[in-house]
């Protein structure tokens, strides 16, 4: 393997916007991220279901006849 052609790999602390720090290996000297597993809604279980403009109600109205036919059968 040739010398001096590969970047130097070292341990760094990646810092999230929430303040969480994770130790990683990288060729970068520092890393800042906006979201991590400590603050992401998928991992924290604090997901919110947002019904914008009544999409669920519109769907139910549009397919109400279809669902009624299946219920009768």
Swiss-Prot record:
Binding positions for Zn(2+) per the UniProt entry: 16, 18, 36, 39
Give an example GO molecular function: rRNA binding
* Keyword Transport among UniProt keywords: no
Could you tell me which SUPFAM superfamilies the record lists for this protein? L28p-like
An example Gene Ontology biological process: translation
Looking at the record's lineage, which domain of life comes first? Bacteria
Cite a GO CC annotation. Answer: ribonucleoprotein complex
Keywords in UniProt for this one? Answer: Metal-binding, Ribonucleoprotein, Ribosomal protein, RNA-binding, rRNA-binding, Zinc
Under InterPro entries, the record lists: Ribosomal_bL28/bL31-like_sf (IPR034704), Ribosomal_bL31 (IPR002150), Ribosomal_bL31_A (IPR027491), Ribosomal_bL31_sf (IPR042105)
Family the UniProt entry places it in = Belongs to the bacterial ribosomal protein bL31 family. Type A subfamily.
Function recorded in the entry:
Binds the 23S rRNA.
| Name recorded for this polypeptide | Large ribosomal subunit protein bL31
What gene codes for this chain?
rpmE
């Amino acid at each position: 393997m040739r010398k001096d052609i590969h970047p130097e790999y070292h341990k760094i602390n990646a810092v999230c916007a929430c303040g969480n720090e994770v130790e990683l290996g990288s060729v970068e000297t520092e890393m800042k991220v906006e979201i991590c597993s400590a603050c992401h809604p998928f991992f924290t279980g604090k997901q919110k279901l947002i019904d914008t403009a009544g999409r669920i109600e519109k769907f139910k109205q549009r397919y109400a006849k279809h669902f009624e036919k299946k219920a009768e059968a």
